[in-house]
């Protein structure tokens, strides 16, 4: 099988959560060591409330490296503006634009269509 893309593995950790919007806490999530590799709080991060299947599906027929828009809207939480690593969070439901590489999502480009 093709190597399960390392960047896809990272993408899943950084941007996909199985938690519901109601249960999701930006501050506790963003203070996880995955998000603070150098001890710094990441200024902003968007989470997709979904299992991995529908997100990976966006890249299903994307060979090479290309930005793709989702055809469905996802519930999203954006964590931002940490003051001493305490985050504000905002929720919305929207399309997402991601970078695909050889059928795997590898980078979150933005909320909304590409």
Swiss-Prot record:
This is Amphinase-3. The active site is at residues 15, 107. GO terms for cellular component: extracellular region. It comes from Lithobates pipiens. Substrate binds at residues 42-46. It is an enzyme of class 3 (hydrolase). Endonuclease, hydrolyzes highly polymerized RNA, poly(U) and poly(C), and the dinucleotides CpA and UpA. More active towards rCA than rUA or rUG. Has cytotoxic activity against cultured human submaxillary gland carcinoma cells. GO terms for molecular function: endonuclease activity; nucleic acid binding; RNA nuclease activity. Keywords: Disulfide bond, Endonuclease, Glycoprotein, Hydrolase, Nuclease, Secreted. Its EC number is 3.1.27.-. There are at least five different forms arising from glycan heterogeneity.
């Amino acid at each position: 099988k093709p190597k399960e893309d390392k960047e896809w593995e990272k993408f899943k950790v950084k941007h996909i959560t199985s938690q519901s919007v109601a249960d999701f806490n930006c501050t506790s999530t963003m203070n996880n060591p995955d998000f603070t590799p150098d001890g710094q709080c990441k200024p902003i991060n968007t989470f997709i409330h979904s299992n991995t299947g529908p997100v990976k599906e966006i890249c299903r027929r994307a060979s090479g490296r290309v930005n793709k828009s989702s055809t469905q809207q996802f519930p999203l939480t954006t964590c931002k503006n940490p003051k001493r690593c305490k985050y504000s969070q905002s929720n919305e439901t929207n399309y997402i634009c991601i970078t695909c590489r050889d059928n795997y999502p590898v980078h979150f480009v933005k909320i909304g269509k590409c």
